[in-house]
């Protein structure tokens, strides 16, 4: 039996929606197209932001903050870039509300120029960069630089338009985490991103048990919170809800908490804890001495982090095929043969604008060019030109 129905294999799209629902990550909001990110989902997002913020600052970058609104004229400067999502933009046309005769409210104070609620940041950042002497991952070439007049002085003292990139992330990373690590029992969270590393589940049959067990759980939580892990300390939650029938345990399995500790009177008497790890089958549990568990919690979490990472790498390797023939490439993405699913394709590639139409017909695009190249010369699948550059191709969904 599994906690999530349907399973990944039965209906991937519905499985994904059920994981979000059962993990209580988010829900729809009254505003169409918007969602409410709930505590677990937002805890994940906060940890992702903090981790990436450290990585960005390690490269010497600094943070800035830009307005939510973009003047329509800014958007129009780079029409090609916004074409894909222009129809999804919200537009602000008035600056206030006023009372209507007979009750209710109506917009008033029409703006001289409509404002776009920005779906992306390049246009407004580009306009500011033009005045400075000095964010997905895209090579934008000189498109935004020309539109926003961003120039620099080269070694010869001549002015040139800047070559710009855009890189950053959104809450879509949470979706990637679900798809990469989730299973048929729900969400699986790598420890370094988990809002809580350990959840303690007190088990008590009567009031006398409750007092003893809760005192033990509070002491255990305090000891665990003093242990270092990652950039901080172990984060612990005690779930003291009065639930029976395994419902409390399964709620945390579906929520992906890395470690579950079930603590009852027998554990107190034995000075032990009963441990369940989210990187292992839900039914698999082990008993550890109290002191041993506390002292080794950091090592256990690091082991889980490593196992999940290696599992993800193995999954990627399993779904990546090296292809050097155009016919095989087309079969890979046609999906007409059993066992051919169209995952990642690693192929020799020469960047040529004329290739775009060929890829569009297959609904495939270049996803990235790996830093580590095979240093093997082969013919580009699309131009036939010899090259030692290899690229990763895939479909975007």
Where are the regions that the model predicts?
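NTP/phosphate- and nucleic-acid-binding module
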Residues: 1-397
